[in-house]
Amino acid sequence: MDTTIDFQSLPTPSYVVDETLLRRNLEILKSVKDQTGCKILLAQKAFSMYHFYPLIAEYLDGTTASSVHEAQLGFEEFGKETHVFAPAFKKEEMEALLPIVDHIVFNSPNQVKLYAEMVK
């Protein structure tokens, strides 16, 4: 199969991902996980090409998000752990996040106090 890409013919802007290189990088991350026992999460802010989430999910443990919509994307398309963090959360956001996230990072003691009962 010829995988040569005529970059001049692509519409711009275009995002081109070399799946072979992506897999190679994922193998490196898997090696780190295997050697250390750590979990590695996909930062969706940095890479939210959800077309590749099934592939990435073979190697990584979950996603990080900083909004309800990002968390929803990770929950629906990645299907593993969903971690969320933000400077502050509104009550409506917490209500939307609780059914779909596994971990919430609060940025202040006031936020912890405000939502302590909700997150138990």
Which residues make up each language-model segment?
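Generic N-terminal amphipathic, Lys/Arg-enriched alpha-helix
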Residues: 1-17
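N-terminal glycine-rich anion-binding loops that anchor highly charged ligand groups
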Residues: 2, 24-28, 33-48
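Active-site-proximal beta-alpha core segment in soluble small-molecule metabolic enzymes
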Residues: 38-120
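An N-cap/entry alpha-helix motif that binds or orients negatively charged groups
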Residues: 12-20, 24-28
